[in-house]
Amino acid sequence: MGRKWENIKRSKAKLDQQRGATFSRITKDIMKAAREGGPDPETNFLLKVAVAAARKANMPNENIQRAIARGAGLDSAERFDEIVYEGYGPGGVAIMMNIVTDNRNRTAADVRHIFSKHGGSLGETGCVSWMFKKRGVIEIDRGETPIGEDDLMMIALDAGAEDLVTEEDSYAIYTAPDALNQVMKQLEAAGVPVEKGEVAMVPTTTVAVSGEEAEQLMRLLDLLEEHDDVQNVYTNADISEA
């Protein structure tokens, strides 16, 4: 009985931790969308998709509205700076981060500590940004898509997309940043559910890492993504599963 209860407690703690991580990620998506396109989901399609993901995850409406207000700067009591950090991870991979913080010094110290403790180094502005290109990225769950790949590609290209990449369980549609909203709206009109859409920094070339370097890199990326002030993390790593 006692051991069973301990197992139940551990399982619940793990589920709570996973739920908290999901809420944290979605909150960051909502804040970013509201910051870039405003607080109205009816006119900001990126925000509409992020809010839909929040509701699907059973995030309380109070949390959703707070994230929108913070992202759009509607809360006059809070002032945030937006910063881009660049650096190198194990194996020489490039890493870029979008930061939103109310204390630049605290965040810089935290991020520098995470890098140095896990085989990386925080660099100067511009040290790796030339290895990335800003693009719109739309993620679609293949299992939720009512049409085939060819039809999906035709709809996306007609709407202004640049490319479609097929993954094991999903599709990734790439657009110019200013075409992202338009393509997402056309997909919705065609009955294609969009899992996520964002303007992201996509690497133009990749660096292969494996073994201990890959493990160390994954730990570094996880810790960066878990930090409250880090909105997005991008890397040009090609991580081998071997």
Swiss-Prot record:
Signal peptide per UniProt: none
GO biological process: regulation of DNA-templated transcription
SUPFAM superfamilies given in the database record: YebC-like
Main location: cytoplasm
Subcellular locations according to the entry: Cytoplasm
InterPro entries assigned to the protein according to its UniProt record, in alphabetical order: Integrase-like_N, TACO1_YebC-like_2nd/3rd_dom, TACO1_YebC_N, Transcrip_reg_TACO1-like, Transcrip_reg_TACO1-like_dom3, YebC-like
Superkingdom, taxonomy of origin: Bacteria
Keywords: Cytoplasm, DNA-binding, Transcription, Transcription regulation
Keyword Cytoplasm on entry: yes
GO molecular function: DNA binding
UniProt keyword Cytoplasm, yes or no: yes
GO CC terms of this entry: cytosol
Family: Belongs to the TACO1 family.
Record-given protein name: Probable transcriptional regulatory protein STH1004
Taxonomic classification: Bacteria, Bacillati, Bacillota, Clostridia, Eubacteriales
